[in-house]
Each structure stands twice: as C-alpha cells, then as structure tokens.
Amino acid sequence: MIEIKNVSKYFSGNKVLKDVDLKIKGGEIFGIVGHSGAGKSTLLRCINGLETYDEGNVIVFGKDLKQINGKNLREFRKEVGMIFQNFNLLNRKDVYHNISLPLEVWGVPKNEIASRVKELLELVDLTDKIHSKPSNLSGGQKQRVAIARALALNPKILLCDEATSALDPNTTKSILNLLRTINSKLGITIVIVTHQMEVVKGICERVALIDAGVIKETGDVENLFLNPSSEMKKLIGQSDDDVLPKEGINIRVIFPKNSSEGALITSMARELNVDFSIVWGKLERFRDDVLGSLVINISEENKEVICNYLVSHNAIWEVA
C-alpha cells in the first residue's frame, strides 16, 4: 500500500529525513512516533505529496509520487484523507457545509452530497450537530467533523497528524475508538503521527520510531513497548537503572497475549525450590489485549538453574 524507499529531505541545507525506509500494509493502523522535531510530520506529509522530498521514492498504490503531477496528483490526493491537531474547520460554515466542501469542489450533485453527509454524520455520531457552527462544538466534536470531512471522498488512506494532541484523555479515547471503527468497517489504512504513547498502545498494530529524521526501529507495538530498546526507553522516559537492584541478577520475563508466564513464575519457585524477589512489574493495555512484564531478582548461585528452567519452558525473557 505505502512503500518508502531511502527517502531524504533537506530544509535550508539541513537533512531532516535521512534514508527513511518503511512499508505500511493495506488495511493496517500504523503509528509513527518520536519527539517534537523528529521529522514524523514531515514524513507523513511526504506520503500525500504535501511535502516534496529530495532523494528516494515514495510509492503509494503502486505509483511513485515523483512521477505524479497536475491532474493526476489531484486524483491521487482524492484517495488520501488527512486530519490535523487543530481541526482546520471553516468557522463561518456549519457542520454540514464543512463536511460537504470536498464533495462540492469535486462537483458531486447536491442530492448525492446530502446523502453522503448524512451517512458520514451517522458514522461519527454527530447527526444532531448538522447545523452547528464549529464555535459551538467541543474539541472532540470538531475532530469528528474533521474526520467526516476527510472521509467524504471515500479515501483508501487516512493520515492523522497529532490528531488527539489537543484533546483530553477521555475524548482521545473516544476518537481512537472511532478510528478503529472506521478501520474495521471501511478497511481504510490509517497512519498516525503522535508523540502520545497511549495513542500508539490504544490503536496501532505496528509502529516506527523516528529520531532526528532517522527510523530507529519498526515493529509490533507490543514487542517494542514490553521489551523496549534503549532508543524506545529514551522516548518513553523509562530507565531501569533507577528501579532495579544493583546486587544479584535481574531477569525480565515478558507476558505476551494468550500466555501463562504468570503461572510459570509460581511453578518455577515451587519446582526448583529457590528464592527470588519480584522487584518490578507492569500491565498495559494494547488495543484489546492486556499484556505485561515483570523483573525478578535472583542470586548468582541460582542463575544457571533458573535460566535453564525458563529456556526449557520456552519463556520470553532476558537478563535486565
């Protein structure tokens, strides 16, 4: 669906995207995370041609964006919707006419516009706000209008640029649920740029970490958060050094979905008759699953027998 090959971009002589490689599958919800200024929004805008790039290729729907221009670029952008942090609604127009605007630009007949706007308002659960002005809407309602407008032309891809950054946690959750519904019902590919880790955990299937214009790693959300690299730890502000004991050996056991590592730990203590301490643990929700990990502290003399036990039971673990 979307393939980015060795893409680089310069601003005023500075290389803001550096040899970026990414593949985003059709129908998935994909996250791009990083600190402010990391290059994530610039990368997102390269996907729909709002930003040009200097090197490499961005291939969408099998077409290289560098080879698309004029009328063909306009047709291409019809297939890619986008929502923003600040909603970008027209304050002088009511909800109906904000949503209908792209349809009007494309010359869709009025009766078809009315039908499509009604359908979209039902999808985003705002039928009672059809004649309201943006000034009379909450932040969450404004974003729902923006989502409806972005979907007006039946795009195959929806790009979300910090779409929940201006919203409170409860409203953010409702918007994420809406996006998941849209993904499920319409099969639309969603690419989300965010610095909010809870957004990634709540909706994304896979995620790429970008820092200073470089893709540091890409993978399943669960794996990147439950067994984070040093780069991911830096992003989420996690440091084991302040938590884990300096004496003994610390072993982290990962709890993926549909696992029984919790029972494994108690069985290990009983069967091996060894002492250890549980020094750190957490449970987190990823989409519909609750996953977690814990760290046990063991003595040097018990290291071999405990590690052999974990290996023999196919546990997911590492020395922390």
From Swiss-Prot:
SUPFAM superfamilies referenced in this protein's UniProt entry, alphabetically: ACT-like (SSF55021), P-loop containing nucleoside triphosphate hydrolases (SSF52540)
PROSITE patterns per record: ABC_TRANSPORTER_1, ABC_TRANSPORTER_2, METN
Domain of life, per lineage: Bacteria
EC number: 7.4.2.11
One Gene Ontology MF term: ATP binding
Membrane topology: Peripheral membrane protein
Main localization, broad class: membrane
Gene Ontology CC annotations of this record: plasma membrane
Domain ABC transporter: 2-237
SMART domains, sorted: AAA (SM00382), NIL (SM00930)
Chain positions recorded as ATP binding sites: 34-41
Subcellular location(s) per record: Cell membrane
Catalytic activity: L-methionine(out) + ATP + H2O = L-methionine(in) + ADP + phosphate + H(+); D-methionine(out) + ATP + H2O = D-methionine(in) + ADP + phosphate + H(+)
Keywords from the named record: Amino-acid transport, ATP-binding, Cell membrane, Membrane, Nucleotide-binding, Translocase, Transport
Family the entry assigns: Belongs to the ABC transporter superfamily. Methionine importer (TC 3.A.1.24) family.
Function statement: Part of the ABC transporter complex MetNIQ involved in methionine import. Responsible for energy coupling to the transport system.
Quaternary context: The complex is composed of two ATP-binding proteins (MetN), two transmembrane proteins (MetI) and a solute-binding protein (MetQ).
Protein name: Methionine import ATP-binding protein MetN
Species name: Clostridium acetobutylicum (strain ATCC 824 / DSM 792 / JCM 1419 / IAM 19013 / LMG 5710 / NBRC 13948 / NRRL B-527 / VKM B-1787 / 2291 / W)
Gene coding for it: metN
